[in-house]
Amino acid sequence: MRALVPMVVAATALASPAPALKPRLDDGLARTPQMGWNTYNQYNCFPNESIVHENAQALVDTGLADLGYRYVTIDCGWGVEDRLPNGTITWNPELFPQGFPAMGQYLHDLGLLFGVYGDSGILLCGSPPNITGSLYYEDIDARTFAEWGADSLKYDNCYSDAATNYPNVNYAPSTSPHPRFANMSRYIQAQDRDILFQVCEWGIDFPALWAPEIGHSWRIGNDIIPHWRSIFRTLNQAVPQTDFAGPGQWPDLDMLLVGLDGVLTVPEEQTHFSLWSILKSPLTIGAAIPGMRAESLEILSNADVIAFNQDALGVSAALRRRWSDEGYEVWSGPLEGGRTIAAVINWRDEDREITLDLPDIGLQYAETLQNVWADETVNGVKTSYSSVVEAHGVMLVQLAETVEEGVYPADVFAATNRDVTTFSDVYAITSSPNFVLNITLTEVTAAATNITIITDSSRRPISTSIPAGSSSISTSVSLIAGSNNTITIRNAPPLSSITLSPPEPTYYTGAQDFTLTSPAGAYTCPDAYCLPAGSKIVDLSTESAATAHINSSTSGSKYLEIDYINNEVAFDSSWGWGANSRNLTIKVNDNNPVRLEVPLSGRHSELFGPGLGWWDSGRLGVLTDGWIKGTNELVLSNEGGEGGFTKYAPDVVGIAVYD
């Protein structure tokens, strides 16, 4: 075991080395995520001219176009099997009697943009009936799309693997799809027209590492399906990709389900739209706009949520904490102007009050908090904010004029009565006597000053002295995990603030500090992988466990940060219950285990990358109960995995214990 530098945010990602991304082409496109409408979710591979005209006009009539939804894309089903004698691709004249150039002009006359759809294989997705793809015809097709007046190209991945005789789908091709997409990108960029290029190869070969060089967005995973469960699956796949987002390069979580009849409830639609927005996914409506229910149209038209997506800073929100047993999780990220956006998802099937502890998103105080869907604005939020969140709903909050985590200005958090100053709403991530308290005075002391410090959990007051000529002093204090601690300071000169730092954690390496039961084993990774330890526990399951004996200075609840590895990507299983997650249980002594369903962590290709993505660490934190002073037994396993979760737990690199 060894000491580990404390983490500032409650949960972060550990990234194994990845090749540096080259700058996106400076073509001025997609400086913020693209927005629009696509035929597929509502009409599948059966679009026609009147469908596109009606929905395009509805974009304008409803005001959606003015809000930014401008790319109108005709997805699969628009073409024919044979090319023209000159080799050019063409549209189905029965479905689009006026033709695609006329369609482009129609959309442009409405102030919209024309999105076309192609495929990097020999046929388009949705065949049969067979519709020709662009493989081996990239040059002529790129020129044709430009001549039609296209403003964007969604480029798909069906019928593309030559080595296996061009099957409809191959999630494990023998070669990367990268060269095929790069080839079309090169020809698109050669046109005398700006065309936004959307890479749609379903997350195969971890496109976040190569797609930003050739396209403006890339699909992070398989198609979204018309079920609530697909939201969890998609978010789990997004976790290791959020930091790849930026102007001109956006992870695409796939089209929106909002507005599709009978698919999602209103709270579910709010959750879906909120998370796609703050993760900086392109926002592409997939439902029919004419006749859409008012609640769905209102969600898609929410100017605040759209603004979060289109924020000029261009930084995605990231997963901060996940409470699997309690059924909720927190995502957050920065916005322009020093603001913060946060989303708390209620995965349970019931309405309930949920509390957001601001330190979980790196904050201690917000002068203003806007609860978007509750239509509520609160001033002076200290440490925590609670609100009722509907079943499968989301608490989406924007925080402004904030103070960073661990900093407690006296004029906000303290009350003074004569020579006694008490700070309330003090947050502790863990129960420990080893928090570092720094007290800052309003001015330098003229003489040495003796003060007394009392906390809720300390058995005796702490007496210390502020030296003459000093304006601050530090000492260790004891706090209890939670957001309701108080710190009382007696006999102190006027105070400016206090600052609290968590205890320095002790790190326990999975492969070295744990005793393993078969079939679990230890695996040593190459240099600079399986961070921070360079090794990991593998094959933890419902039938095996890893046990460590850990000394604790106090009893109570302890915060742990778990460095895990999971790259079990849900490709075929995405159509069913595949969730891109693995289940881990953490048991302290004889207490009930805490369950943590971890997302993907892989940041390299699952087909060709180092370790196939199984050397890339992620990190999530959990609060565990039942610790005693002295020696504790900590057991990692997958208890209950046979009851609907995956059999195997994630690989475990190690655990940091905050004591």
UniProtKB/Swiss-Prot annotation:
Active-site residues, as the UniProt record annotates them: 156 (nucleophile), 223 (proton donor)
GO cellular component annotations of the record: extracellular region
UniProt main location, coarse: secreted
SUPFAM superfamilies according to UniProt: (Trans)glycosidases, Glycosyl hydrolase domain
Gene Ontology MF terms in the entry: alpha-galactosidase activity
Catalytic EC class: hydrolase
EC number assigned by the record: 3.2.1.22
Transmembrane segments annotated in the record for this chain: none
Disulfide partners: 125-158
pH effect summary: Optimum pH is 5.0.
Top-level taxonomic group: Eukaryota
Binding-site list for substrate: 201-205
GO BP of this protein: mannan catabolic process
Catalytic activity: Hydrolysis of terminal, non-reducing alpha-D-galactose residues in alpha-D-galactosides, including galactose oligosaccharides, galactomannans and galactolipids
Temperature dependency: Optimum temperature is 52 degrees Celsius.
Pfam families, per the entry: Melibiase_2, Melibiase_C
Glycan-modified residues: 48, 86, 130, 183, 438, 450, 484, 551, 583
Keyword vocabulary terms for this entry: Carbohydrate metabolism, Disulfide bond, Glycoprotein, Glycosidase, Hydrolase, Polysaccharide degradation, Secreted, Signal
Free-text function comment from the UniProt entry: Hydrolyzes a variety of simple alpha-D-galactoside as well as more complex molecules such as oligosaccharides and polysaccharides. Active on paranitrophenyl-alpha-galactoside but not on raffinose, locust bean gum and gum guar.
Family to which this protein belongs: Belongs to the glycosyl hydrolase 27 family.
Name this polypeptide is given: Alpha-galactosidase D
Protein species of origin: Emericella nidulans (strain FGSC A4 / ATCC 38163 / CBS 112.46 / NRRL 194 / M139)
